């Protein structure tokens, strides 16, 4: 049975951690990122919402842990999204998925330890090789790396009871319209659809009050 709107919880402080999927690709307007749409849906229910996007383009999961986690903890949020790992694959000729898993485990562990009541959400990574212009050897490396990355993300999320949005297995992951000109970063359509999935998950898994849909 779905929780009635009057019984749903309000988010007071939302912090978004991650790479360019959170921070926005270079040139992306600061109000056009998927956490921005998520915050907009939350603010419709609670106009007093505080929203902090700490994401940075080009960072690995270890760099998220090293540079973004401490400021996040200092803000004492009741909702945190952590979406990262793509750069662990794209920026290395030998993707170190164990390093990603170790860093993600550390992030989730610290958040659970310091903020036991926080709502935590992460996501898998769409198959980046689908739309990137890559040579065969690089395509295999990226394809295999993303598969292993997502396996690790799911495993760590499950261990820490973190809701994991399935962007990797979503039919939209193969639709070109959901990606920008570079074939890597999401398009405006893709961003809005990702935010819509996030809003639905907040309502379903946490009983968090939002607008019904992303505007």
Language-model regions, residue ranges each:
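Serine-esterase "nucleophile elbow" of acetyl-processing enzymes
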Residues: 1-57, 67-76
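Alpha-helical cap/lid subdomain in secreted, periplasmic
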Residues: 46, 66-215
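Ser/Thr-centric signal marking residues that sit
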Residues: 22, 60-61, 81, 124
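Short N-terminal helix/helix-N-cap motif within the alpha/beta-hydrolase-1
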Residues: 25-26, 62, 91
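Flexible, active-site-adjacent loop/turn segments at secondary-structure boundaries
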Residues: 19, 32, 62, 177, ...
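Short, flexible loop segments at the rims of nucleotide/cofactor-binding pockets, characterized by
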Residues: 56-61, 141-142
